[in-house]
């Protein structure tokens, strides 16, 4: 039995079983499917004169005469070359009689009839292991001692004069081959077997059948006939595999019929060979990197196993990359064919996707990341890494992926987590570097500031705190960001990209905390032209998410329905309602009804949370979240209906309009009419005039985090229904019960019992009921709005979850559990400051106790709240904490929008935020 080719007539074996492979000639197999436009050049070099053993050509790289990992010839690392394992003569598989007949070849690592060592047969169902054929051990390296010199000579000659086969075909033929090279296979396709040199360093070979150019009876992209590919390992992997024997294994594949995500993959292995099942193989030896994916994981693309090789010589096996959007275009299909009776050389052909048409992304080995499939790393190596044509050195351990420029160079202003939109407010006493000018004609200037460790940790843990660095014109009272074209900024030797936008109003500031470090920090400003007209400033800013601000407004600025109705009646009695013309277009007195649109004037979509400014005299509302998003970057804070100033702290959420929107939320009405008695009815939509709405307003992120039905009490909805047309009775909502952590998984909820808001929001007019009276709870407790202490408590905003709200700015450490060790030691109980408002509430102020202190290790995850916080909070002021009853989903009611306070609020020198920073 000839174990090396069990399907061929047995030949008399040599003493070591290699006699049949010594100088057996293999003719050139011209494929009938070779394109007419192909060109093949084959060069054969003679001169191998001393072949003492048959292994000289069958295994030209016998490494016994070379130390493990040593290089026997220039350009080849550790005994590897283009002829690492040339096609053993006679071992090419030729499909005879179509796809129904195939020769079963020896496995990839199989050698045969050598005692000792471990076998390296693959686990294909069509291979020897799958047919129950005996596996064979690898030959000991000592058998190659006498052939070392001849092997080196043969390999050197073969490598130096390796044949180059280039294929240039027409564009359509090229694309046709690439698209059909997988689908043309039959279930009985032959699997080619190749052989590595024995006893020498071993690397990952190309499994037969996995290379589109190495499949028997099939045309590869190079246009060559059915020549089996030689498994070529990377030269850089030589030292790691020197002297090792690898265990038997098989390349893993997905289970039969399992779909494989197509990311640059033409077809999954199980689809290419429906009748063949790849075994779930293991990995290489334990001290090597894992090449095969774990069981159950889909393998990489077929071309990846053949596509990732190191260059043999700069001019011979250079990696070829065609320009393309992403991924690798390096797809060498190294094919070795026995040419003649005494030279087992071969030609190396490279398929260049970019030669004759648009490039096609072909990922290299390791494969491109697939969902659920970690990219297997390449084996570490001390030799030269893979070199691209642009001479960029790429790590041999990492996949050669080319992400977009945006991911390679993220904008420093992109500090928004989870795509959350954030508002930006200056912090009182938060200026780190006072506004300064650059010296005239000074090209490079350095500006140093210090960050204490505690402040740095707080900045890192609080996503709503940032260090903002911006430039503005010295005459701009609003200090709008404006970067001169010649300004470049780097922080701690890290260059930052400045977003200047299309016009001067779209310039964005830089946010530096991601490049800062504890202690000394240096901002370097480089200019090529004079910028004396501009000022630079570094300040601490509070950047609450839109979600948290939205929640705070819902809790503090939700005007009761009675208030809204009173306001509407008063406007009717006065005879004028600006901005809302009557049905006949008249704005005069004695209006019978007012037509109000249910669409937001910003987005032209159905309003979700109706709001307007405190000074607005119209009933028409805008969508609150859209308004906040509109003012994120450069807030003008003007009402889109009447263009009056509508600052954040003066916004009002109209509970009356909200009830109407909830009542008709499942209808297509676009307008309603409201009469002087506040009775309302929808305006029927005319079918001939109804056009599907297209949002032609600003493109805003729609991240609805509020369930409006939970904002209104059943009595309010009953009142809305009574004032409505009465077409269908409104089913009242169930009274909200006291919230529990399991019922409302909101962040940081510590309020379990019935109660009311910590402080009633200042009412718009002294005669209208405020929010605390509307909630019908116990008297409100005082609220302590202190910005410096709030900046030392962690933000609890989390990614957007349906029906879940993030709290607003966390302002009171006693009410906000957070990392206790982050509070500044010198901060004691601080008196609260009050928002400037036309009619402030005369609630008394009770300073609360000092926040809890303790190591950061006390942090624990509370599954009920979904946030990190101390296991138990027993600080002062917690025992009498009231809870919400009106808004069960909205927790942390102690957080008023106090971060909106102007910088001239009363300050306390003991907790001046500026003391947290050390300026030079």
Curated annotation (Swiss-Prot):
Increases ligand-dependent transcriptional activity of AR and other nuclear hormone receptors. Zn(2+) binds at residues 616, 618, 639, 642. InterPro entries: Znf_MIZ, Znf_RING/FYVE/PHD. It holds the Pfam family zf-MIZ. The keyword Manganese does not apply. Residues 366-379 have a biased composition (Pro residues). The modification Asymmetric dimethylarginine is found at residues 245, 262. The modification Omega-N-methylarginine is found at residue 111. This is Zinc finger MIZ domain-containing protein 2. A zinc finger (SP-RING-type) spans 585-671. It comes from Mus musculus (Mouse). Keywords: Isopeptide bond, Metal-binding, Methylation, Nucleus, Ubl conjugation, Zinc, Zinc-finger. GO terms for molecular function: transcription coactivator activity; zinc ion binding. One of its GO terms (cellular component) is nucleus. There is a cross-link at residues 402, 457, 692 (Glycyl lysine isopeptide (Lys-Gly) (interchain with G-Cter in SUMO2)). Its main location: nucleus. It is found in: Nucleus.
